[in-house]
């Protein structure tokens, strides 16, 4: 289980000002709780690529944003990610939903290529990442922020189960 309120507590610890992205079924509960939050502003975009440009601009303007999207949207965002957050050296953390993860288990009836392409893409693009499978992994968010600041580049934390 991955509880949205515990993720939000980690974001508060990092003093996140904005969460930028596109909601999906896996992050629905997290978005719902963020919309009710009084200090973190949620900014929705129509495409995931816009999230990286907008978050990069917010960072340059002095805000402390986070991108929240799904892996399929991350694929769509590739060039915008490269041209903004990565090339500009923005220490931006993304929480990325891992659609299709369970389809890679032995005996699964079908494999979702969104899952099989995901980690190889992160590796090819030199994006440091970890994966949260449950509440015990939420500390990875803090580590992602430390790593992003250390290398002055984006990092990612993958959200494997749906948030509750």
Where are these regions (language model features)?
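Thiamine diphosphate
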Residues: 1-164
């Amino acid at each position: 289980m991955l509880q949205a309120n515990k993720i939000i507590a980690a974001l508060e610890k990092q003093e996140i000002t904005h969460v930028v992205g596109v909601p999906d079924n896996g992050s629905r509960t997290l978005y719902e709780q963020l919309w009710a939050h009084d200090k973190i502003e949620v900014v929705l975009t129509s495409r995931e690529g816009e999230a990286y440009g907008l978050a990069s601009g917010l960072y340059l303007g002095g805000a402390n944003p986070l991108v929240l999207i799904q892996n399929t949207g991350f694929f769509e965002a590739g060039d915008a990610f490269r041209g903004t957050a990565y090339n500009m050296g923005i220490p931006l953390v993304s929480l990325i939903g891992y659609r299709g993860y369970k389809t890679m288990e032995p005996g699964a009836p079908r494999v979702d290529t969104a899952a099989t392409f995901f980690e190889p893409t992160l590796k090819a693009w030199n994006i440091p990442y970890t994966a949260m499978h449950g509440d015990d992994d939420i500390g990875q968010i803090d580590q992602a922020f430390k790593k992003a600041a250390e290398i002055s580049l984006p990092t990612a934390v993958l959200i494997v189960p749906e948030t509750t």
